[in-house]
Amino acid sequence: MKQHNKMKFTDGSRIFFTSDTHLGHTNIIKYCNRPFSSVEEHDETIIKNWNEKVGPDDIIFHLGDFAFGSEKQWMNYLDRLNGKKYLVIGNHDWRNLTPGVCQRFVEVSQQMNINIEGIHIWLNHFPFLCFSGAWKGLDASWQLFGHVHTSPYADSGLDHQRLVNLFTTQFDVGTDNNNFTPISFNEVKEKINVQMMSLGMHRN
């Protein structure tokens, strides 16, 4: 792991985000009401969806809780997935951050601070109550996160009641919240614009 410096991207059209894939985690199907009959079906669906959307040269930020299992299993998953992969460490990831795993990511960090097309974005595993730039109106920073397993179809998380307090520029990029598929920067931008419009704000 290395200290993260802010990355700037002038074109966000091939940048993607995801979180909480929990590959190899049998019990996540029950815990989060995921619509799969086995962990094999779960894993293969997530891998298929990822590779259909993310190309080999695209950039994807994974915001933590990538997989369960051994170092070998992690490396096998990573070798099957498209894209230049960045990992923001989740609470379940620490035990598997071996040299063999880390070298399969462009970068591994507890937090990332990026800028895409002039938008400042904090990337964390957990949602924050406040973050730098949150109060700047139309020029507000974003915070993208995972961990809470938001679902548009079911209340599957203990944090459901607290999530009403999020800023309009925060969004859960977790796989439960996005049809078990990575979400693009442009799709996140559309979601955040809708949230901002609910307060009479809009960003082009």
Predicted regions and their residues:
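Acidic, histidine-bearing metal-coordination/catalytic regions of metal-dependent phosphoesterases
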Residues: M1-S37, F171-N204
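Histidine (H) residue identity feature
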Residues: H4, H22-H25, H42, H62, ...
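Core catalytic region of metal-dependent phosphoesterases/phosphodiesterases
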Residues: K8-F9, F16-T18, L23-N115
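Conserved beta-sheet core of the metallophosphoesterase superfamily
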Residues: Q103-R203
